[in-house]
């Protein structure tokens, strides 16, 4: 079956978004042109530039279209399953990038907020990673560091590796976060032993250990909330 959808390559060279991006840089392209590069093809009666422009207009702009559900996207004329999935993937990447880039100046007031801050990164790893969230006196995030990779045990996780950067950053407190690749956040005996050891060290160092959060597959356990810290 012949694909009659109008493609970017069907447009004149000076109107093709990809060529314009390569020649002038991505910053000069409009939102509709950038979306056209992602979606690639138009419909039988509408080229991709016009389609992208209409999608943005009918959805209330870039923020609007990136927050639509699959069902809502499918209601927009010209969007089928493939284009809806492409837009959903683009929106999710944008959300993850925004969360990753904007963690600084975030104030942590609950274990849930701390877990949400690192959930997407930690749940994607197939090995255990130990993150240290460093906070100032107002519980605002200074930095997040990945200090250990591999199964958590006392021979690998040394207090020196955990506390050296918080000391250099003048952190007032820290929150430990690590993942269980199995998806089950239930703490192991080793998790509890390491937490106890690091908590005792925090008393001498003067940097308070507020919590140890274990990340599973979209779920978490706070040792503080469980009364284990």
UniProtKB/Swiss-Prot annotation:
SUPFAM superfamilies: RuvA domain 2-like. GO terms for molecular function: metal ion binding; metallopeptidase activity. Keywords: Hydrolase, Metal-binding, Metalloprotease, Protease, Zinc. It holds the Pfam family UPF0758_N. A motif (JAMM motif) lies at residues 178-191. CDD domains: MPN_DUF2466. Residues 107-229 form the MPN domain. Zn(2+) binds at residues 178, 180, 191. GO terms for biological process: proteolysis. Belongs to the UPF0758 family. This is UPF0758 protein CA_C1241. It comes from Clostridium acetobutylicum (strain ATCC 824 / DSM 792 / JCM 1419 / IAM 19013 / LMG 5710 / NBRC 13948 / NRRL B-527 / VKM B-1787 / 2291 / W).
